[in-house]
Amino acid sequence: MERYTEKAKEALILAAEAAEETGSRTVGTEHILVGLMKEGTGTAARVLEAGDVKLERVLELEKKLVSSSQPTQIRDREGYTPIARKVLENSYREAVRFHAPLIGTEHILMAMLKQTDCVAVRLLNTLNINIQRLYIDLLSAMGEEGAAGREELAQGRSG
C-alpha cells in the first residue's frame, strides 16, 4: 500500500469494505469501482461523477447481478480476484507511464477501463456508460489529449 496516494489507499479500503458488505470473500473490480466512487474526492471519483456514473445505480446493479446475500469478512486486505489484482498491477504501470511518484485513483480507474472483461466495466456498460468517453475524460482530467486516449484505449482492449 506504500505505492498508493492517500486517496487511492482510502478507495482500496472502501473497496474491501464493499466486498465484505456484499458477502464476497475477495475484492473484485466491482468493489474497487465502488471504493473509487465512495472515496469521493480523487480524480477517479470526479470523472465518474461527471460521467453520470451514480453510486446508487452501481450498487443496485452489483447487488442484483453479482453479490451474495451474506456479509463476510475478508481475511487479508490482499484478497483480490485475479482480474482485480491485474488491474492494480496495471495501475502501477499507468503511474509509471505518466511519471507519477505514486499510484493515484486515476491510475486505478485507467487500468480498470482498459480491462474490458472485468466486472466493473461490464457493470458500466450495462448502465449505458460510454467507456471510451470516460477514458477520454479521465485523460483530460489528468491533462492529456483526448485523441491519443482513444488510440490508447483501443490498444488496451486488443492487448
List where the protein language model places each region.
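Histone-fold recognition with a strong bias for associated Lys/Arg-rich disordered tails
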Residues: M1-G159
